[in-house]
Amino acid sequence: MIQSQTYLNIADNSGARKIMCIRVLGASNRKCAHIGDVIIAIIKEAVPNMPLEKSEVVRAVVIRTCKEFERDNGMMIRSDDNAAVVIDQEGNPKGTRVFGPVAQELRQLNFTKIVSLAPEVL
């Protein structure tokens, strides 16, 4: 569960390393984000000489969470870290590579570009 003030690792090569969630997009009273949800975040750590810089406000989609996620068939999905991918306004990733596994639920949520860039789909 990702809520406000939660730090996430970035799982792509867009130039950001860590972000801090400031808002979960969706309903106005929504408190937590899960896999596949879009958040608004601030970049806290960035790679030098890259397009994204520290303290920039970006949109990101959550691809892995430490909190377990239950599928319809009863299978539980859990990861070692909270990770996200930086996206633009249309939902396309800003990076050209995605590191680590992603959940297959992203394909159903129309993030097919992220799924196609990922090395493994769970």
Swiss-Prot record:
Q: Name one GO molecular function term.
A: large ribosomal subunit rRNA binding
State the source organism's domain of life: Eukaryota
Please tell me where this protein is predominantly located: plastid
Cellular component (GO) terms are: chloroplast; cytosolic large ribosomal subunit
Key word Disulfide bond present: no
Where is this protein localized, as stated in its record?
Plastid, Chloroplast
* One Pfam family recorded for the sequence: Ribosomal_L14
Q: Is Chloroplast tagged as a keyword?
A: yes
User: What is a biological process (GO) this protein takes part in?
Assistant: translation
Q: Which UniProt keywords apply?
A: Chloroplast, Plastid, Ribonucleoprotein, Ribosomal protein, RNA-binding, rRNA-binding
Which InterPro entries does this UniProt record tie to the protein? Ribosomal_uL14 (IPR000218), Ribosomal_uL14_bac-type (IPR005745), Ribosomal_uL14_sf (IPR036853)
NCBIfam families found in the cross-reference section: rplN_bact (TIGR01067)
Enumerate the HAMAP family for this protein.
Ribosomal_uL14
Family indicated by similarity: Belongs to the universal ribosomal protein uL14 family.
Q: How does it assemble?
A: Part of the 50S ribosomal subunit.
Q: What is this protein called?
A: Large ribosomal subunit protein uL14c
This protein's species is: Pinus thunbergii
The gene that this protein is the product of is rpl14
